[in-house]
Amino acid sequence: VTIYAPFNFAELEINLKQALYDVKGIAAVRYPKGGELPCPAGYVPNFKPYTYLRSGKKAVLLITYGRIFANVLSAAKELLRQGLPVSVLKLTRIHPLDEECVQIARRYSHVLFFEEGSRRGGIGEYLGSRLMAERFSGSYRVRAIEDFLTTCSTASGLHQVGLDVEGIVAAVLAERSSDAPTEEPDEPA
């Protein structure tokens, strides 16, 4: 089974074509209700299973997929403004997970996965198990939905579970504050 999780309508169109014409076997496209979010400046959808936006440092990697990519990218910009550059890995094909995504994550000392879905049995948990099988020695955290939410707006629900911009920034800062200050090596080009 192949599962896509596009961020916006442009990616949705690309993934629907891939599901119909490129995938041999069963394919699904996960797209949340609520319409399209504005596309972040400079982001161009592509046919790849993931998009990797490097900061040049190997300390912190934020991973996500789908709608909350906009929040993760906004949080990354806020963290950079505060002096903490982070890299972002946006998954477009969430199953099967591209092996290169595991290898990218292994290079970081802190990996935080933000998922608008159930923590138990989710993609974040799966990637964590893959990293552990690869003997990943850094820290790995998943921020996802732990329990059922009461009926609320999307914005309110994302805020409740810490998947809004402020919650993502706070999670990264909390993760980094648990660290002793270290010099961050530059990432190879």
Question: What is each PLM-predicted segment?
Answer:
Residues 1-22, 171, 176-177:
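Conserved thiamine diphosphate
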Residues 21-189:
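Thiamine diphosphate
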